[in-house]
Amino acid sequence: WTKKVPVFQLQKFVSGVEVAVGAFFNGKDFILPINVNFEHKRVFPGDIGPFTGEMGTLMFWSEPNRLFHMTLEKMKPALVESGYIGYIDINCIVNGKGIYPLEFTARFGYPTIQIQSEGITMPMGEWLYKLASGENFELKTKKGFQVGVRINVPTLFVKSTDKETIEMYRDLPILFKKPDSLDGIHIEDVKIEDGSWRVAGVSGCLMVVTGSGTTVSEARQQVYT
């Protein structure tokens, strides 16, 4: 194993809730509101199945809160010094004893950005241009919660050398119960041939389906219907 993993880090396990807080940064300050999100990493609902990079996320927009003040906000001087512009979040384990930061993500998250677009009511090009220009503005967002669910096929779990599985799902058609209503559908490895949606590529990641609601149950129901 020393050849495959020459260096590894042993970390102390902390039991708690995994939660991330993120915000867009214009080079000088954070753009409000902030984003609080909870990733779902196992392949099936109910924490069933193997771990994936991410199968979906629940999120909401908020004014700066304790989690933000104790973690991400402390990075402001370093972000200003580096001239950073973009999205940044920090993932943490939170329990009754405190907040334990895990890692930073200094880029758009996937499928985080698709789910955020469900909750942001401003045109995407408008707020991205303002952000890149270093403007100070407030994001217009929906109240309540947004949920995103990633739709995959089994090629997500195989190596590129597994030709049998890859061929099994190559170019398969993708059908919708309501083909005239595609709100909340964010495509990934999908192509259109002769008017039909089909599986493209070998990543196994087809699309992200998003929904929103004043409660988590409402947002989840919109995604699945």
Segment roles from a protein language model:
Residues 12, 23-25, 151-153, 211-213:
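Short beta-strand-to-loop capping motifs
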Residues 69-88, 105-182:
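Active-site "cap" helix and flanking loop/linker of ATP-utilizing ligase/carboxylase catalytic domains
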Residues 95-99, 106-109, 152-156, 192, ...:
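Short, glycine-/Ser/Thr-/acidic-enriched flexible segments
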Residues 44-46, 136-138, 191-198:
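Short beta-strand/turn micro-motifs at beta-sheet edges
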Residues 165-208:
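Generic long, charged, amphipathic alpha-helical segments
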Residues 209-225:
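Short, well-ordered alpha-helical segments
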Residues 56-60, 149-150, 205-213:
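Short, well-ordered beta-strand elements within core beta-sheets of diverse protein domains
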Residues 1-116:
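Internal nucleotide-binding/catalytic subdomain
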